[in-house]
Structure formats: C-alpha cells, structure tokens
Amino acid sequence: HHSKHHATYVKGANDALEKLEEARAKDDQSTVLLNEKNLAFNLAGHVNHTIWWKNLSPNGGDKPTGELAAAIDDAFGSFDKFRAQFHAAATTVQGSGWAALGWDNLGEKLLIFQVYDHQSNFPLGVVPLLLLDMWEHA
C-alpha cells in the first residue's frame, strides 16, 4: 500500500506541480485549473495517507485515556457511542473515501465526518486526528 498507492499520490503531486509551473509560464489558464485540481487530489491523497500511517500501531486498539478520552465522552457520550458513529461514517462512504475524526478549533469539540475520494472536504477550522481509509484497495 505504501510503495504503490501512497507513492503514486506523491508522484502525482510532484508531476502536477511541474505542469502547473509550465502552464502558468504559458499563461494557459485552463491547464492551470486542471493541474490545480490534480495537485489538490494527489496532495490530499498524500496527506491523508501520512496521517493514516501515523494512526496505525502494532499494539493499538485500546480505549484512549486522558484528554482524548474526555473529549470523546464530551462529544459523543461514551467511547462505545463514538465507535458506533465512526463505524457508521466509515461503512457508509459512498464510493471511495475516508472516515475522519477531527478537532473543531472553532467549536472546541471533536467531529466525525466523511471525506470523499481524497478531496480534503474537512470542515474549515477542523484538524484531522484519525483517518480510516475506506477505498476499495484498503
């Protein structure tokens, strides 16, 4: 997964940056827009996978403690309710995407949401903490 899918997003982002520079030099606005879209997709794929790798642990799977446990209880009522909502978000992604847990800096609480494909449709002000890859290859 790391050497195939993740590496493809890194290469795609680098390629899009090169093509974007060329298109800007030629003042080719339609190609600029196309490559900005390609850059956003591939860069988001890279960032999402980078967070996902950090979430994986050979000894993981236990309930959180401390501030995270308190924030989960505050936002969802209990760890079991959090897990049920996160599971629902993950298993109902239409097509390809991600389930996400993020910290809302404005509301100062945890939120669960879906990310479609790799498009970083995180709500503004939300920092992703936990991502679960729900693409068919995952």
Swiss-Prot record:
Family, similarity comment: Belongs to the iron/manganese superoxide dismutase family.
S-S pairs: none
One Pfam family per UniProt: Sod_Fe_N
Keyword annotations of the record: Manganese, Metal-binding, Oxidoreductase
InterPro entries cross-referenced by the UniProt entry: Fe/Mn_Superoxide_Dismutase, Mn/Fe_SOD, Mn/Fe_SOD_C, Mn/Fe_SOD_N, Mn/Fe_SOD_N_sf, SOD_C_sf
Catalytic activity of the protein: 2 superoxide + 2 H(+) = H2O2 + O2
Textual note on the cofactor: Binds 1 Mn(2+) ion per subunit.
Keyword Lipid biosynthesis annotated: no
Catalytic activity, EC: 1.15.1.1
Residues involved in Mn(2+) binding: H1, H49, D133, H137
Name of the protein in its database record: Superoxide dismutase [Mn]
Its job: Destroys superoxide anion radicals which are normally produced within the cells and which are toxic to biological systems.
Originating species: Mycobacterium celatum
Leader peptide range in chain numbering: none
Molecular function terms from GO: metal ion binding; superoxide dismutase activity
Entry keyword Transferase: no
Cofactor: Mn(2+)
